[in-house]
Structure formats: structure tokens, C-alpha cells
Amino acid sequence: MSDALLGRDDSPIGEELWQVLDHTMLDVARGELVGRRLLELDGPFGLGLKQVSLADEEVGDGVSIAASLPLAYVYQTFVLPGRDIAAFEREPSSLDLSPLVTATLAVARKEDDLVFRGGEHAPGLLTATGVLRARLSDWTSVGVAQGDLIAAVT
């Protein structure tokens, strides 16, 4: 996403702090997101992408309708107190990033919930029509989980 849409140039936050925020957010998200480990997911694409165009659907002789897939906008607000930001600008080791971490975890969980359970306009992996299910056994013994997964996909 471009810095213009993020408003970074208008922000009182310096480049060093933006790098810390970006690095922290990406590290936390990568450690939490499960759906992106199972599927090839793209994004984020920025605020301007609201839908993806699909193939036109013919609804009559010489009549077709453009189909599109609406995209979810997943977000969570958080606050870093101005005094904390000012203290970081003076001494870079003194910033409490827990609000950012909490918000990042919330966004990652929302994304995974959409991937697995879906939403009002799109099914998830566990709720789609025709989804296959398999019974799992007790995974406390080594190798049982692997065996269950192999049996489920073969």
C-alpha cells in the first residue's frame, strides 16, 4: 500500500518508528496466521480494492452480466499514546507496542475466521457446500496426526 494512502507523510511519526511498527506487525501476523500457511493468499492490496472481477455470466441470448467477488476489509483500531511516541523518538528503546500486537493478533484471527468459517457473502473452508469431513483419532501418540492427515487426503 502506498505511503500516500497510509498518510505517513502527514504523520508526526518518524521513519524509524514506522519501521519498528511495520516489523512488529509483520512478525506477529506471520506467527499467528494459519490460513496463509494452507492456502496461497494474496494481499493486503490497499484500501482501494473492494472487489475482484470474475468472468461475465450469460443470462440470456446476447445478454451477460458482469460478476464480481466482494472483498472483506479486515481491520482493528489501536492507540499508541503521544507521550509514548515522543519518548520513543527521544530514546528508541522505550515504546510499549502491546496495543499494536493486540490489534495485529485480532486482525489475524479475523482473517483466519473468514478463511475457515467464512462470512455472510462467502463460505469458508469448513462451511463451503460439499466440504469433505474425516474423523480424527487421538493425537497424543507420535505419528497419529500425520496418519490421520494422510488418510484424509488419499
PLM features: residue spans?
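Short, compositionally biased low-complexity segments
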Residues: 1-4, 71-79, 122-129
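N-terminal "assembly arms/tails" that initiate or stabilize quaternary assembly
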Residues: 1-66
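Charged, low-complexity surface segments at secondary-structure and domain boundaries
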Residues: 2-15, 83-88, 131-141
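Serine/threonine-rich low-complexity intrinsically disordered regions
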Residues: 11-14, 22, 43, 53-55, ...
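Conserved active-site and cofactor/substrate-binding residues in soluble primary-metabolism enzymes
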Residues: 16, 20, 75-80, 94-98, ...
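Generic N-terminal helix/loop capping motif
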Residues: 28-35, 81, 106, 110-113
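Long, hydrophobic/aromatic-enriched structural stretches that serve as scaffold segments
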Residues: 52-96
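Alpha-helical scaffold segments that mediate packing/assembly in large oligomeric complexes
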Residues: 87, 91-98, 102-154
